[in-house]
């Protein structure tokens, strides 16, 4: 009953507002039901067919699309020969007689009628696919310090409209800096690659964009609804687009002696995803203004950026750009339509009445419809911003490094947020709250900075997702579980055949043995490397190919290639591709920002889950 309904909640500031609730009464229980909203624009994906050689034959896997009915079945073909006697319901198949030279297709069967064949898939020789990269040459700073490049965070979008994802990759110089550190950095480079390694373009953000996790937040999404993804990010004088055109003054250099850029114009540019061509450039907002307004005068807190994609009207995507979270905080929303950028709203914590929204942001954000109106809200650390740019609530618990938003507790209506907090004087070092109202459902005092926290269903003995932080594991109700915790507090990934989530850290995937309280290794990707130092995050984690399980993208140790790893473990569970889930897809868009976090779904995906709701979507 829980997952077939969603409570339409009042915001805290709207005590007198009239809220329409459709009430379903069963015995003594009352379940508020969300009215059906408008369909959302989503990507027109192909089958994502993948075939991988295993010891038991060829493992074949494909997408179940959000546009398809639950009754659809499939036929699997090898070299034009149908393999299954009767149509199969699963979205994976093991061909025991396949060979390395085989080619596979699948055909949907709708009401007994076979549909056209999918794209063809050749067999991978190993459980990963290599995407060769054009590694850039290093350089030298104005102080004579040399640097090299390594592949860093990535995102995905269908930039050419063929139904297959392309990879958008950030190159990080070896001298990239945290905002707290002085020093010059190399230029930030952004590349686009097809999965066969074809490089589509390279954007050089130039000397006036500093390199580091908090500076460049790149959004890859079909913003204008033409069926092809754009790329949006902060730019500056000297940025060179994918066609070689320079934005602004090519000779300008605003770096000070500390290598920081605290003066000069700032721009927001939308680039064509297929070519890297500049489509439109506007003045960047939130604007810098006075550096000292943001919490210090040397340029640390002024340049703390985040970004995201949100369906503010419930139907089409908008761009969110943010600045600041330790003190002054600003969020600005834009639409990119018909070749033009238009600003929708600004939330500024320095404005009268917004004081509660200062100093509450994280190094990450989440985006979801938390109040049931069909329109997305921005979960900005310890606060939330409504689709219209007005603050919904602030818990006052302040900044933190990790944040998880989803249906963490299926035993109660709506979505929840699990967050850790940095302030040692905060009432809670880790908190579990109602995503719509900010009500703290439970929390644990820490008395110190709790730097990491994770949420995933890893123990079927307890309903909902478990959460762990500060050396302890808890149920969704706040009950402490045992004395051990998983081997990592980083990412979670759906990898094996059950509905529980595995742990992803560095170049490893582990599974929590809940009965014995230890983690067991499932995969160690030899020759692959994680990113971002001690954060040890993947280049990307997402449901990129095949069935609903997730792929992980790591760089090779020398950054000569990216490797897309996929599971080869059969599963009886069939779910719509996670990339057609509204919360999950937006989680992939924001995954590259600042301190990367794993995506979550709009519904509870775990042991004992109810039937997954069919995505309410359309494709351009």
Swiss-Prot record:
Cofactor note: Binds 10 calcium ions. The calcium may have a structural role. Requires calcium or manganese for activity.
Binding sites annotated in the UniProt record for Ca(2+) 6: 371, 373, 377, 386-387
Binding site residues for Ca(2+) 8: 457, 459, 462, 464, 466
Positions with a binding annotation for Ca(2+) 10: 543, 545, 547, 549, 551
Single GO BP term: cell wall organization
GO CC terms, sorted: extracellular region
Binding positions for Ca(2+) 1 per the UniProt entry: 153, 592, 594, 596
Outcome (variant: residue 595 to F): Strongly reduced catalytic activity
Regulation: induction: Up-regulated by growth on type I rhamnogalacturonan.
Record field: pH dependence: Optimum pH is 8.
Binding positions (substrate): 152, 172, 452, 532-534, 595
Residue numbers binding a carbohydrate: 187, 207, 238, 255
Alphabetical UniProt keywords: Calcium, Cell wall biogenesis/degradation, Lyase, Metal-binding, Secreted, Signal
Domain comment as written in the entry: Rhamnose is bound near the active site, but there are also additional rhamnose-binding sites far away from the active site, which possibly function as a carbohydrate-binding region.
Family assignment from sequence similarity: Belongs to the polysaccharide lyase 11 family.
Primary role: Pectinolytic enzyme that degrades type I rhamnogalacturonan from plant cell walls and releases oligosaccharide products. Degrades rhamnogalacturonan, polygalacturonic acid, pectic acid and pectin.
Protein name stated in the entry: Rhamnogalacturonan endolyase YesW
Protein species of origin: Bacillus subtilis (strain 168)
